[in-house]
């Protein structure tokens, strides 16, 4: 989860062998014979693979995954344990393999990304979230579902999307994205200057 940063992530140039079991009626399972180099690598672990209870149609295949297609969609990913909010946008179908990493798919992801990474969100989680006891917060799914998301019109949703797209293609930095999106969010919820100062002093911008 350490590769996950605020808004984005650092790819460690590592590849995941996804010998999936397919999706019934939609996607055929991986046939390991089509990938001799991968098979040769996995054969070194045959004893362990063949004995595991969660295998697919063959020991080479992973067990069935109902949300396999979600990994190929644009998504927000985050680690469960972090000192600050670090929600990243992944638009290219990459896998983020980590035991305590979560993903979110659906509509209006750029807007949700900006809300989740805002000082407003961090202040909220400081009140309702659980901690590890060493200064980090556990960004659990059930806690995130309690976050109140302001309703915005189509024009504003498109504006957030444009800002995030500029970040994804490298036209603006994460610092600029944070500055632009937070300013809009403060206006959406109607914060006055004193309230903005309180929130940002409570959790100063993190890049």
Locate predicted features.
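Polybasic, glycine- and aromatic-enriched phosphate-binding surface used to engage nucleic acids
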Residues: 1-158, 205
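Non-catalytic DNA-recognition/assembly elements of restriction-modification systems
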Residues: 37, 151-207
């Amino acid at each position: 989860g350490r590769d996950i940063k605020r808004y984005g992530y650092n790819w460690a140039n590592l590849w995941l062998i996804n010998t999936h079991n397919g999706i019934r009626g939609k996607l055929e399972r991986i046939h390991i014979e089509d990938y001799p180099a991968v098979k040769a690598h996995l054969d070194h672990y045959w004893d362990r693979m063949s004995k595991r209870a969660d295998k697919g149609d063959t020991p080479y295949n992973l067990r069935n995954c109902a949300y396999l297609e979600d990994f190929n969609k644009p998504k927000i990913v985050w680690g469960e344990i972090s000192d600050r909010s670090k929600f990243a946008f992944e638009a290219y179908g990459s896998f983020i393999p980590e035991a305590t990493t979560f993903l979110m798919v659906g509509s209006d992801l750029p807007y949700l990304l900006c809300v989740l990474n805002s000082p407003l969100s961090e202040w909220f989680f400081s009140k309702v979230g659980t901690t590890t006891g060493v200064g980090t917060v556990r960004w659990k799914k059930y806690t995130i579902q309690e976050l109140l998301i302001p309703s915005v019109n189509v024009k504003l949703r498109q504006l957030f999307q444009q800002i995030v797209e500029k970040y994804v293609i490298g036209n603006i930095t994460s610092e600029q994205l944070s500055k632009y999106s937070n300013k809009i969010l403060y206006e959406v919820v109607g914060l006055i200057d004193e309230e903005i100062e309180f929130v940002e002093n409570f959790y100063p911008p993190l890049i």
